[in-house]
Amino acid sequence: MVPEEEPQDREKGLWWFQLKVWSMAVVSILLLSVCFTVSSVVPHNFMYSKTVKRLSKLREYQQYHPSLTCVMEGKDIEDWSCCPTPWTSFQSSCYFISTGMQSWTKSQKNCSVMGADLVVINTREEQDFIIQNLKRNSSYFLGLSDPGGRRHWQWVDQTPYNENVTFWHSGEPNNLDERCAIINFRSSEEWGWNDIHCHVPQKSICKMKKIYI
């Protein structure tokens, strides 16, 4: 026969059971609080880190360009593409059209100081965009030259020269001594490329990659 528990023993057992339940509840609440804190801190730290990187990148470009014009890329508001003000943008690049006239070498140096190169034209679509911003009574240096005068044309950024993607005027290039390329307007053919002496001052077009922050 099992001896009957004393009331005092039952109360002590009930108290101990309640203590364990409350202890488990407190521990659970603490764990949930920690999880919530971590889930809040991680995105905050991520955003802070990304902001610091953006500011660092902006400071890097400020040595060339004190002002940037930025637009949101796609649906993610955290991704922005920027071009220096007042450069124009097309696809993944930014373009600057000079108003002053210099030799080809000085024009390339001027672009380089701004973190760019004389323009390299890769597609018909790119050329069509560029000519919308040009004046018909002016000529503009391209980043295309023939240093050896042997018709071995090369782009300043080492992009391979592809004769299938060129837009020379009819009959051009036509002079081995004219070792630099310009884009200009001819009433009979509209816009196209022409070879010219590199020392003859012309306007120019600079091109650089968009700045992503």
Swiss-Prot record:
Glycosylation sites: 110, 137, 164
UniProt GO BP: adaptive immune response; antifungal innate immune response
Outcome (variant: residue 200 to A): Significantly impairs carbohydrate binding for the trisaccharide Gal(beta1-3/4)GlcNAc(beta1-2)Man
Domain C-type lectin per the UniProt entry, residue ranges: 90-207
Binding site for a carbohydrate: 139, 178, 184-186, 194-195, 202
Subcellular location per the Swiss-Prot or TrEMBL entry: Cell membrane
Topology within the bilayer: Single-pass type II membrane protein
Record carries keyword Membrane: yes
Residues at which Ca(2+) binds: 172, 174, 178, 194-195
Main subcellular location: membrane
Ranges per topology, Cytoplasmic: 1-21
SUPFAM superfamilies the record matches: C-type lectin-like (SSF56436)
Function: Lectin-type cell surface receptor which may play a role in antigen capturing by dendritic cells. Specifically recognizes non-sialylated galactose-terminated biantennary glycans containing the trisaccharide epitope Gal(beta1-3/4)GlcNAc(beta1-2)Man. Binds to serum IgG. Efficiently targets ligand into antigen-processing and peptide-loading compartments for presentation to T-cells. May mediate potent inhibition of induction of IFN-alpha/beta expression in plasmacytoid dendritic cells. May act as a signaling receptor that activates protein-tyrosine kinases and mobilizes intracellular calcium.
Protein name according to UniProt: C-type lectin domain family 4 member C
Organism ancestry: Eukaryota, Metazoa, Chordata, Craniata, Vertebrata
